[in-house]
Regions:
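Adenosine-cofactor binding site in Rossmann-like domains, unifying the SAM/SAH pocket
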Residues: 31-52
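N-terminal Rossmann NAD(P)H-binding glycine-rich loop of SDR-like oxidoreductase domains
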Residues: 2-24
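Mid/C-terminal beta-alpha module of Rossmann-like enzyme folds, strongest
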Residues: 198-249, 280-287
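Amphipathic terminal alpha-helices
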Residues: 263-289
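NAD(P)-cofactor binding segment of oxidoreductase domains
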Residues: 59, 78-108
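Catalytic helix-loop patch of NAD(P)-dependent Rossmann-fold dehydrogenases
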Residues: 85, 89, 114-152, 156-162
Length: 289
């Protein structure tokens, strides 16, 4: 049974990775959180405390460390210092510490399509990472590319455990009683649900996937179409109004040839089913499940 250590286990991606992998009952899981324990026995870590990080790695000796820690767009705008340390520097620190303290282990790090400007779309490995904002540039610098570790470049949507999430999914549900919301028809997306990311991580562990990999279903969808699909899947009463909005296309071409990402409708229905089975986690969304 492989041992997996999940950093940032209380976040949007981290909690889903934990609960999905736990449901498979084939891993011994350890979780690391910033302030509040996810499971009652999580390690609590200030990421500036490298001594505690070393102790956690030495004590658990995980086969895989999944890094779900990150400063998002708003946080990056608020604190460039935090964005540089957490998004750019910390993934490389983790990779270095793993090599020094854990035998035969690897890092799985989550990157973003926001390393691209969104001026072109259908981005591949050959395209220049041309983002000019703090978030995009720091995530660019944080991509760990070597012969041992794995960086998954993607974009995610999914539920939050906290009340003040900033993702698109949480924004929609937080405003579900509004009469109407704007959906951007000129903003193109090609990401996955957090549940699908968790499934991909299971695949990556099983197949020992390494290097830099891009994750998508190779299908483009506008933010307007995506919001419409979410409202239909979760039976939300709000009307989505089509507006041009922000012009951006950060769609990426998937590179994981042996793994098939399903359609958006299937991903969202799978997410709905997962959330319905785990209502205790998602009390703020409960009426929609």
């Amino acid at each position: 049974m492989k041992k997996v250590l999940i950093l940032g286990a209380g976040g949007m991606a981290g909690h889903m990775v934990y609960y999905y992998l736990d449901s498979l009952q084939k891993y011994r899981l350890y979780t690391v959180c910033h302030k509040t324990s996810l499971t009652g026995h999580s390690f609590i870590l200030d990421i500036h405390d490298t001594n505690t990080l070393t102790n956690i790695l030495v004590d658990t000796q995980p086969d895989v460390i999944v890094n779900c820690i990150g400063v998002l767009i708003k946080g990056s705008q608020k604190s460039i210092k935090d964005a540089v340390y957490i998004n750019a520097y910390y993934p490389h620190l983790l990779s270095d510490f793993i090599g020094k303290n854990v035998k035969s282990s690897k890092l799985i790090h989550i990157s973003t399509d926001c390393v691209f400007s969104g001026n072109k779309g259908n981005y591949t490995f050959d395209d220049k990472k041309d983002a000019l904002d703090v978030y995009g540039m720091t995530k660019n610098l944080g991509e760990v590319i070597n012969g041992r570790d794995l960086t998954i470049r993607t974009s995610i949507i999914g539920p939050e455990l906290k009340k003040n999430g900033e993702g698109l999914f949480h924004w929609l549900f937080s405003n579900r009683t509004a009469q109407e919301l704007n959906g951007y028809t000129k903003s193109v997306w090609s990401g996955v649900t957090t549940l699908e990311l968790a499934k991909t991580i299971d695949f990556a562990i099983t197949t020992d996937l390494i290097g830099l990999q891009q994750l998508s279903n190779n299908k483009q969808i506008t933010k307007y179409e995506l919001l419409k699909l979410i409202t239909a899947t979760f039976n939300l009463p709000v009307e989505i109004k089509p507006v041009d909005g922000v012009i951006s296309d950060k769609s990426i071409v998937s590179s994981i040839s042996d793994y098939t990402v399903p359609s958006y409708s299937v991903m969202l229905q799978d997410l709905h089913n997962f959330m319905s089975k785990n209502k205790k986690l998602y009390t703020q969304y409960e009426e929609t499940l």
